[in-house]
Swiss-Prot record:
It catalyses: ATP + H2O = ADP + phosphate + H(+). Pfam families: DEAD (PF00270), Helicase_C (PF00271). This is Probable ATP-dependent RNA helicase DDX28. Monomer. Found in a complex with GRSF1, DHX30, FASTKD2 and FASTKD5. Associates with the 16S mitochondrial rRNA (16S mt-rRNA) and with the mitochondrial ribosome large subunit (39S). Residues 377-536 form the Helicase C-terminal domain. The gene is DDX28.
């Protein structure tokens, strides 16, 4: 009995070992056993990833053709013949760029056309004479700029409205000829209107308000030859030099018929009673979207209060009681313009002119986006600049603009380029006025091919010789991106334009995704104002004691 229990246990174990197992087949002695080289869990993950990639929608091309969007991963390419609907979703090449694994990824928005959309294809009979300009103004234009033969779309729409005496708000893409669209009517208005007896202080009849000294110098360089040909004197008034310099500028005789000024310098002169706006008959806010920003809005409001803005075209007919015609010009539609116009003029007296490509990605400029780590940006920039200098070109070569978001980054990056023996110029807002003077003019004359700058060089400045724009720091807003990208591909440019943007931060990726989606849909960038909004009526203040 003592041995029966171990014998019974041994027989049970033997029975379990010798019992057939489920799921196993009998193998021959010569058949090799299966070898597991990849863990089963990892193998399942790979199979799931491959199935997701197979299920991604891919654009089907009937035959090869040009691309609208070309990406490093071909499944995100979009042919030029395909346009996504407004509500149609699409996989974006930048969809996963907020992940660190997306570093070194890139995509490009290719050129859809060669010619700038601002150039209007007129018939051989279309010219400036058809717009209502007088022969004297046409002769001056032909003498000063013989290459300007046909008006652009913006000029064809803006000049007739200004000649009718309407207040005009013109918002059109960069490089579309907006400067001439207001200068020619301005000079014609001053030629028709007699000059009144001058006061004891200068009293210009035309005023062009601009946000920066560089833009003031550029507008003066365009307006001065035209004015000289018509017997009108054009001068500028720049800030940053102190009151002594402002007094010297305004003390020159004879006083200017047209004054190009920055808001700060003009307001100092008005407070000191060195200048009067009582005889003003034409007021232009160039780059109005910038002038109506918080940094300038208070000064602009004070200047407009000193100006006598006409209520309508009828007020402009009194030659001995001049009132000013108001013109607002910008590459993006200025926010807050409704509140501004409500203070100085009737909204019904303002004609709004916008181009069909307002706030759109420029179709004739290639735009590339690189997802980079912050530490890799310097090496990538140096590579781009050295490759640009060594590039073999059959046609004319252009210059390079490198944009940074702060003055300190411009200075630091300049030291890096000095170490690499890359010659360049620097332009940023914290420079003293004497140091800033003439830097952009030197760049325009190609004394240096590379300019490191902040957004001070992104507004309005003529850059027909620029071939490449590099956003070392991605712009903080879509408006800033439009202005920076607008430095290339301008009317009159002899070189094709390209924009390269370094994308580093998650908030940069959010803006890039909006740009990519707008390009795939061929629509304007989202969230930008495109019409004048009337201000909301103010609520009456109720006394709490009632």
């Amino acid at each position: 009995m003592a041995l029966s229990r171990p014998v019974r246990l041994f027989s049970l174990v033997a029975r379990l070992i010798l019992a057939p197992r489920r799921g196993l087949t009998v193998r021959s002695p010569d058949e090799p056993l299966p070898v597991v080289r990849i863990p089963v869990a990892l193998q399942r993950q790979l199979e799931q990833r491959q199935s997701r990639q197979r299920n991604l929608p891919r654009p089907v091309l009937a035959r090869p053709g040009r691309l609208l969007v070309s990406a490093r991963r071909p499944e995100f390419n979009q042919p030029a013949r395909l346009t996504l609907g407004r509500w149609e979703s699409a996989p974006l090449a930048s969809q996963g760029w907020k992940s660190r694994r997306a570093r070194r990824d890139h995509f490009s928005i290719e050129r859809a056309q060669q010619e700038a959309p601002a150039v209007q294809k007129l018939s051989s009979e279309g010219n400036f004479a058809d717009l209502g300009l007088e022969p004297r103004v046409l002769h001056a234009l032909q003498e000063v700029a013989p290459e300007v033969v046909q008006p652009t779309t913006v000029q064809s729409n803006t000049i007739p409205q200004l000649l009718r005496g309407r207040h005009v708000l013109c918002a059109a893409e960069t490089g579309s000829g907006k400067t001439l669209s207001y200068l020619l009517p301005l000079f014609q208005r001053l030629m028709v209107q007699p000059s009144l007896d001058s006061l004891r202080i200068p009293a210009p009849r035309g005023l062009v308000l601009v946000p920066s000294r560089e833009l003031a110098q550029q507008v003066q360089a365009v307006a001065q030859p035209l004015g000289r040909s018509l017997g009108l004197l054009v001068r500028d008034l720049e800030g940053g030099h102190g009151m002594c310099r402002i007094r010297m500028q305004l003390a020159r005789q004879p006083s200017a018929d047209v004054l190009v000024a920055t808001p700060g310098a003009l307001w100092k002169a008005l407070k000191s009673r060195l200048i009067s706006l009582e005889q003003l008959s034409f007021l232009v806010l160039d780059e109005a979207d910038t002038l109506l920003d918080e940094s300038f809005l208070e000064l602009v409001d004070c200047i407009l209060e000193k100006s006598h803005i006409a209520d309508g075209p009828a007020d402009l007919e009194d030659r001995f009681n001049p009132k000013a015609q108001l013109v607002l010009v910008g590459a993006t539609f200025p926010e807050g313009v409704g509140q501004l116009l409500d203070k100085v003029a009737s909204p019904d007296a303002v004609t709004t002119i916008t181009s069909s490509n307002l706030h759109c990605i420029m179709p004739h400029v290639k735009q590339t986006f690189l997802r980079l780590k912050g530490a890799d940006k310097v090496a990538e920039l140096v590579h781009i600049l050295k490759h640009h200098n060594r590039a073999e070109r059959t046609g004319p070569s252009g210059t390079v603009l490198v944009f940074c978001n702060s003055s300190s980054t411009v200075n630091w990056l300049g030291y890096i380029l000095d170490d690499h023996k890359i010659q360049h110029l620097r332009l940023q807002g914290q420079m003293p006025a004497l140091m800033r003077a003439g830097i952009f003019q030197s760049f325009q004359k190609s004394s240096r091919d590379i300019l490191l700058c902040t957004d001070i060089a992104s507004r309005g400045l003529d850059s027909t010789g620029v071939e490449l724009v590099v956003n070392y720091d991605f712009p903080p807003t879509l408006q800033d991106y439009i202005h920076r990208a607008g430095r290339v591909g301008r009317v009159g440019s002899e070189v094709p334009g390209t924009v390269i943007s370094f994308v580093t931060h998650p908030w940069d990726v959010s803006l890039v995704q909006k740009i990519e989606l707008a390009a795939r849909r061929r629509r304007s960038l989202p969230g930008l104002v495109s019409s004048v909004k009337e201000p909301l009526p103010q609520q009456p203040d109720f006394d709490k004691s009632d």
